[in-house]
Every structure is written in C-alpha cells, then in structure tokens.
Amino acid sequence: MNVTLLIPARYGSSRFPGKPLAPINGKPMIQHVYERASLAKGLTNIYVATDDDRIKAAVEGFGGKVVMTSPDAASGTDRINDAINQLGLKDDDLVINLQGDQPLIDPTSIEQVISLFERHPGEFEMATLGFEIVNKAELDDPMHVKMVFDNNNYALYFSRSRIPFGRDTQDYPVYKHLGVYAYTRKFVQAFAALPLGRLEDLEKLEQLRALEYGHKIKIAISAFDSIEVDTPEDIRKCEQRLAVD
C-alpha cells in the first residue's frame, strides 16, 4: 500500500505568526514534525505542503521534501487536496495528514492509523487519533478538542466543549483529538468538494463535515499525548518535555 504523509504548514497565524519556523531547541518546529514523522514505519513519502517560500527554504535546508500549494487554499483539507493532485496519487493510495503544529507526535501513533486501514479494508473512509485526557485543565479548554465514539471506535462527535457531560459524576474518562488524519486520495477529493457543514461552521472543526454527511471516522486511541503548539508558551512546554525525554 502506498502511504504518503503530508504536513500542511502556513506562515500566517493570528495567534502565532511564523509558527512553523519557531525554534524549538535550535531547530524550526516544522523540522521536529518532519523528523518525528520520518521515524514511522510504513510510509512511502513525506512532504510538507505549504504556500510560503520561507517554509519551503527551511524544509529543503534540512533535506525535507516540499510541495507548493495554492495561497488561496481555504482550509487544511483544501491544501492537502491541492498537494495530492500535484503528486499524482492513485485513488486508493493512503494519505496521512499530520498537522504541522505537532512537534512531539509519537511515530507509533502514525503507525496506528495506518494499521486501521490495513486491518479493516473498506470498512470506513477516514481515521484519526484520540488520547485520554490526563491534564484536567484541558477538559474545558476549547483549544483541546474533545471526542466521543461508539463501542466499535467510530466517532460520534467532536467538540470544543467537554463531552460527554456527566450529570451525576465528574469521574469518567474524556478523550481529546490528536491532529492526525488518514484517508484515501479518492475520499480527500470527495470531502473537499462537500459544502461547509452547519456543525463544522459552528465549532470550526473540519472533521465534523465528514460526520454531517454520513461518513464514518474510525478512532485509534494513542498511548502517547502530543502537545499542539498554538502559542509561544506551548513552545516552552515542548522544550521542557524534550528535556526529560
């Protein structure tokens, strides 16, 4: 099975401009993401998908591969769709979408989503990762997206609010979403062509579009948390984690 991992990266960010190039222990964040991903087994190719020449230069500077995408991409999925069209992938090729703000992603977590497609061919069109929340401060933080899933590990909903809500107890597991997606090239193209979903627009979560239009999302639960970098403070958290790893 041909497996291409794409890391969408854009320079502009309202909260953290230039985030992909922010240094973490002397290396740009995008390099940490790329090098972590390269340790995952089963990948055919890895590319950074960007529209920014500064990011392109940084990636090529450490020996990584880049595909330049349109600056008009309205979303991460549109950027991924643009990239796979340029790369000429086949309909049944597997695409891994690893968010470029995951510098501490564990390579085995990437292998988990690949394994879902290998073990359950044809049963679903999209897969992603979850992690049981340990840090209680994340429970009500809208930057940490929560998720619920059924007994077969198919997603029921994703939200910036705490879900599920325990009416009579607070002692129950809550899972957060980690920024890794897997799908076939054919599904990416179909997904990108769908109109914006009502719930997607409310929560500002693209994965809800898939659920709103009746597509199944399989969930793998990772044993490893991953810090999502949204602010300069998150960079410091990453450096602290790396110091003890």
From Swiss-Prot:
It is an enzyme of class 2 (transferase). GO terms for cellular component: cytosol. It is found in: Cytoplasm. It holds the Pfam family CTP_transf_3. Its EC number is 2.7.7.90. GO terms for molecular function: 3-deoxy-manno-octulosonate cytidylyltransferase activity. GO terms for biological process: lipopolysaccharide biosynthetic process. It catalyses: 8-amino-3,8-dideoxy-alpha-D-manno-octulosonate + CTP = CMP-8-amino-3,8-dideoxy-alpha-D-manno-oct-2-ulosonate + diphosphate. Keywords: Cytoplasm, Lipopolysaccharide biosynthesis, Nucleotidyltransferase, Transferase. InterPro entries: Cytidylyl_trans, KdsB, Nucleotide-diphossugar_trans. Pathway: Bacterial outer membrane biogenesis; lipopolysaccharide biosynthesis. Activates KDO8N (a required 8-carbon sugar) for incorporation into bacterial lipopolysaccharide in the Shewanella genus. Belongs to the KdsB family. This is 8-amino-3,8-dideoxy-manno-octulosonate cytidylyltransferase. It comes from Shewanella baltica (strain OS195). The lineage of its organism: Bacteria, Pseudomonadati, Pseudomonadota, Gammaproteobacteria, Alteromonadales. The gene is kdsB.
